[in-house]
Amino acid sequence: MNKQPVVMVVDDDPDILDAVTTILSTQPYAIVTARDGLECVDKVRAQIPDVMVLDLLMPKMDGFAVVRELRQNPKYASVPILILTSVREDASRRRYELETGLAMDVQDYVEKPVSPQDILERVRNLLESGRRETDSREAP
């Protein structure tokens, strides 16, 4: 029997964390949550997720630093990451974040608000692409 895919959701906004968790709980996923980047990295060390949904702007350790930390370690470097973020500041700040987010080594990027169907589809696509990558590495 296949194990449930582990999806880690990282956001400092408890309402967003609860909303994304509720959306993902409609699927057969094991969901792990973290409220900041430090907690995220600690939890990844304990259990490597199959996909991560990551906010960028958080206290203690932001999403940019989380991505850098994970990508530096071969054990965690292949975890697919969906950046889920919003910027309430001016357009120049928003543009900076979008360009920086897209330049990072992540698989997908979406701005809040996002529809439940969009989150589910993006996570499903990342899980499928992650499985294909794992299968190709394990093939003789």
Model-derived regions: residue spans:
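Non-catalytic signal-transmission and effector/linker regions of two-component phosphorelay proteins
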Residues: M1-V6, Q117-P140
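Two-component/phosphorelay signaling modules centered on CheY-like receiver
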Residues: P14-V32
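Short hydrophobic/Thr-rich beta-strand motif most characteristic of the beta2 strand and flanking loop
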Residues: P28-R35, K43, V110
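Acidic catalytic/metal-coordinating carboxylates
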Residues: R35-E39, D62-R68
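Active-site beta3 strand of CheY-like receiver
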Residues: Q47-V53
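Active-site residues of response regulator receiver
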Residues: D55, T85
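Receiver (REC) domain active-site loop signature in two-component systems and cognate sites
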Residues: M58
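Alpha4 helix (beta4-alpha4-beta5 surface) of REC/receiver domains from two-component response regulators
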Residues: A65, R88-V110, Q117, E121
